[in-house]
Regions:
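Mid-chain, well-packed structural core segment of small domains
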Residues: 80-87
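Core segments of cupin and vicinal oxygen chelate
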Residues: 13-56
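Short, charged/polar surface micro-motifs in flexible loops or helix N-caps
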Residues: 52-56, 64-65, 87
């Protein structure tokens, strides 16, 4: 019998400015802190964040991380997507927090609304309206 994957446990993100990214994910996006660890030997932090559905983000800081490759179609993680109940309401909230969002579009395959914005390190983040 083939073993089964149960789903995603976490996404790991390396921040160029730990304090700014911690504020963004917790204060703007509403993630809850599970644990924060400072590792002196690495001069780095690891912050475990959680969302209501149990999904998690591990936010890391390192003294001199290399910059992110900006080509959006390069191999690797393309974007992070969050599901929301009302995309119009969430976009209005983000705009009120001075977070720029692309215009809301409709997925031609599913008929669901979606949009993109960026985190403090320009990681593309998608909002996807979840009506089911």
């Amino acid at each position: 019998m083939k073993p089964q994957l149960l789903g995603f446990h976490h996404i790991a993100i390396i921040a160029s400015n730990y304090t700014r990214s911690k504020h963004f994910y917790m204060e703007i996006l509403g993630a809850k802190q599970l644990n924060e660890t400072y590792r002196a030997e690495r001069d780095s932090y690891k912050l475990d964040l959680s969302f209501p559905d149990g999904s998690q983000i591990e936010l890391f800081s390192f003294p001199n991380p290399p910059p992110r490759v900006t080509t959006p179609e390069a191999c690797g993680l393309r974007h992070l997507a969050f599901k929301v109940e009302n995309i119009d309401e969430y976009v209005a909230y983000l705009l009120g927090k001075e977070v720029s969002c692309e215009p809301i579009r409709v997925d031609e395959l599913t008929g669901m609304k979606y949009t993109f914005f960026r985190d403090p390190d320009y990681l593309p983040i998608e909002l996807y309206e979840n009506n089911y």
